[in-house]
């Protein structure tokens, strides 16, 4: 394993929020390499790692998507650059709540999307976790 962390260069940019999860697991919220952007699984956790909107799948999805939108902006991307989303939910019967939030952010963009039920997320109060991939620029 390399002990030297990758540096931000014209070809690679990383953005971290500094949340406890990112520090504990050593990952970035978003990484851009060239025109590709990858946003890590994002939940409704605030800066201190506390769950936002416990019990409300819709509000958790909205909060996560706002965090994703900001993370994208930090590496020079926008929601309209998103080409794929992955939504992990702990109760698929609440798909419509999460789907409604997704639609509010991605109407007209219509990225490829997958929603799957998982048995649980790292924090049991989290009901949804969202990842996105984006491509920036003219292609």
Write out the residue ranges for each language-model feature.
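N-terminal presequence-like segments and the immediate start of the first folded domain
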Residues: 1-66, 70-83, 89-139
């Amino acid at each position: 394993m390399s002990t030297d962390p990758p540096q931000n260069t014209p070809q690679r940019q990383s953005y971290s929020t500094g949340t406890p999860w990112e520090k504990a697991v050593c990952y970035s919220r978003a990484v851009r390499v060239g025109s590709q952007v990858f946003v890590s699984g994002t939940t409704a956790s605030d800066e201190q790692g506390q769950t936002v909107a416990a019990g409300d799948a819709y509000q958790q999805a909205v909060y996560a998507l706002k965090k994703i939108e900001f993370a994208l902006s930090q590496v020079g991307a926008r929601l309209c650059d998103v080409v794929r989303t992955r939504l992990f939910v702990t109760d698929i019967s609440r798909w419509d709540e999460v789907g409604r939030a997704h639609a509010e952010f991605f109407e007209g963009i219509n990225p490829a999307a997958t929603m799957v039920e998982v048995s649980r997320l790292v924090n049991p109060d989290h009901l949804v976790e969202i990842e996105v991939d984006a491509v920036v620029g003219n292609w």
